[in-house]
A protein has these predicted regions:
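Conserved Walker B
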Residues: 124, 131-133, 159-163, 167
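Conserved phosphoryl-transfer catalytic core
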Residues: 160-161, 165-232, 236
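A substrate-engagement module of RecA-like helicase motors
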Residues: 15-127, 131-135, 189, 203, ...
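Walker A/P-loop
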Residues: 1-9
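Alpha-helical scaffold elements adjacent to nucleotide-binding pockets in ATP/GTP-utilizing enzyme cores
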Residues: 9-10, 33-41, 52, 137, ...
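Short helix/loop capping segments that flank catalytic or ligand/cofactor-binding pockets
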Residues: 32-33, 61-62, 136-138, 143-145, ...
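Short basic/glycine-enriched coil/helix segment immediately N-terminal to the Walker B
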Residues: 115-127, 140-153
Length: 271
């Protein structure tokens, strides 16, 4: 009852005033419930278009998840394929564009389902998705929130008490030295040159930990805090190196096939 009680008046007001509604949740089950509610509201002729965004990784049709045009056929000529098939127009005729619908279109037309859902969202009246798409500085929807003015939006935060912990995690990245050293050893023991390049990368990354440790040794009085400034330029350079290595690794994985259900390098990259 609370979902439709929040959505119905918001959608009605948005349609009357040319606004877009974002309904964000912390749980997939709540997103599914909201999408189901919208499907009932957005019957043919109601004049409402809605899209349910699934996580990018879960939407991927490849065995190995790495978004780069050089290794993903679903990203290659994406715009051309969408335009030639007039997919956006087709999808906007539906009351609700679900992840399953986008996946089906992606398979049939060899295009990225996630990008398709984002393009549909540009024209939709209601968007349902995770907190990430609004609040995560690393994955928020820049096409909607790049500007500082949000006068054209209505934001509904489902179970907002969950947002505190999520927000804290968004702005508190974690890097474990034990994990870095574990990957260093694993890569160094592989015979392939590419893995040795990864080992060199992890060796350099491991060298940053003493710098971070030394910067936290300043005595702090109870009730006060001390800022810790990581070597941002060094991390930025390593990030560029990792991007290059991951492209090569994605090509390698396409050639050799999946190694396991949970790839350690892939998990590290997206952590």
């Amino acid at each position: 009852g609370k979902t439709i009680a929040a959505l119905y008046p918001a959608v009605e007001y948005a349609l009357q005033h040319g606004l877009r509604v974002f309904f964000v949740t912390a749980k997939t089950t709540q997103q599914t419930l909201a999408a189901s509610t919208l499907q009932q509201l957005a019957q043919p002729g109601a004049g409402v278009s809605a899209v349910h965004l699934r996580a990018k990784e879960k939407s991927c049709l490849n065995d190995f998840y790495y978004c780069h045009e050089s290794v993903c056929e679903y990203a290659q000529d994406y715009a051309g394929k969408v335009e030639r098939a007039q997919l956006i127009e087709q999808l906007l005729d539906l009351p609700l564009v679900s992840p399953a619908v986008c996946a089906d279109m992606g398979q049939r037309h060899r295009i990225c389902p996630f990008e398709l859902s984002l393009d549909v969202a540009l024209e939709a009246d209601v968007i349902v998705g995770d907190y990430n798409y609004v609040f995560d500085p690393g994955s928020y929807l820049r096409r909607f929130f790049q500007d500082t003015s949000y006068d054209d939006c209505i934001l509904i935060i489902d179970e907002a008490h969950n947002l505190y912990a999520r927000g804290r995690d968004y702005y508190s990245p974690v890097l474990h030295q034990s994990r870095v050293r574990q990957l260093l050893v694993q890569c160094a023991n592989e015979p392939t040159r590419l893995f040795h390049e990864f080992a060199d990368f992890f060796q350099v990354l491991d060298g940053f930990f003493p710098l971070l440790h030394d910067s936290t040794l300043t005595p702090v009085q109870p009730g006060t805090f001390t800022p810790v400034t990581p070597p941002l330029e060094g991390f930025a350079a390593l990030r560029e190196q990792l991007e290059t290595l991951m492209v090569d690794y994605a090509i390698y994985r396409r050639r050799t096939g999946p190694l396991s259900s949970h790839d350690p390098l892939q998990d590290f990259y997206y952590a």
